[in-house]
Amino acid sequence: MLGEQVGLGVRVESVDLQDSTISDRVEREGGATGEVQISLAWEDRNDLDLHVFAPSGERVYFNQRRSGCGGELDVDMNARPTSSTPVENVVWKENAPSGTYRVGVHFYRHHRRRGTKRQTTFTLRTTALGEVAEFTGSLVFGDAMLMVTSFTLP
């Protein structure tokens, strides 16, 4: 991905394309794949939220699931603490617009009654026109949104 930037406190991981954990979760929840796909996975019942800022300036997230430029949040998990292997997924199935995409993660809700910790580690995978990148980071409940990465499509 051209012009990729990485946020503070975020590690870039080598991508094992044989490891289909994130893809399996997206498929399990009925999520789509496409020209641009950003998926977030974590390992507890807390509610993390994926935020993707499109080149148009629109934000795709739980409160605006579709953008006018074709982006869609098609999987949003753990508003209620239903899964210990959650995933979220934002996708542009086709005709992804040119420009810069910025990706953030927010620790929205700590589900204390489910025995979850106040810190959650996550993995974020971006796929853009066939190029895959993976990032890991962690958030503490109460932190501001962590801007994980940005990338530019020509």
Put a short name on every predicted segment.
Residues 2, 6-154:
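Intrinsic-disorder/low-complexity signal
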